[in-house]
Amino acid sequence: TLTTALTVGILKEAFGEIVTNPSGANMITGITSTFLTAKKAKSGKKIAVLEIDEASLPKITEYITPSLFVFTNIFRDQMDRYGEIYTTYQMILDGAAKAPEATILANGDSPLFNSKEVVNPVRFYGFDTEKHDPELAHYNTEGIVCPKCESILQYRLNTYANLGDYVCLNCDFHRPE
């Protein structure tokens, strides 16, 4: 919700009216209502910035074709909705695959978003930090295993939960540059 609000604020200054769902109505009925109640743009062009529920994305991308997806994070505290984080990520990928021309802007600090080949073009963002020696993350960190060899990932810097400058010491999997 914060990422959506910040993005809308920036784009509104540059382009005027933006279609968005600030109330958090992020499932198909809420997205539909957002478009039905949107003001008509003076330029005739509409820019939409939408926060979309993970499981709703495959349904929504049957009806709209985004030009950009932004993947920020998936944490284990979201498991009560759709089970394991890998299941949630697969739902997101299934939705993105229905718009294969759309670029995915993914948080490179999340090992999950760097774990699978996708049909979409991908760009990564993340913190540029000093390099430290890899070490096991704090016991409170959400343990993520290497998607290539299933070893426990280590972190040169752990910023929050499973995010940071990760590396697998058993194979070549690491945070994208």
Task: Pin down the residues of each PLM region.
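Phosphate-binding loop of NTP-binding sites
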Residues: 1-124, 134-141, 145-146
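Adenine nucleotide phosphate-binding catalytic loops in nucleotide-utilizing enzymes
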Residues: 121-177
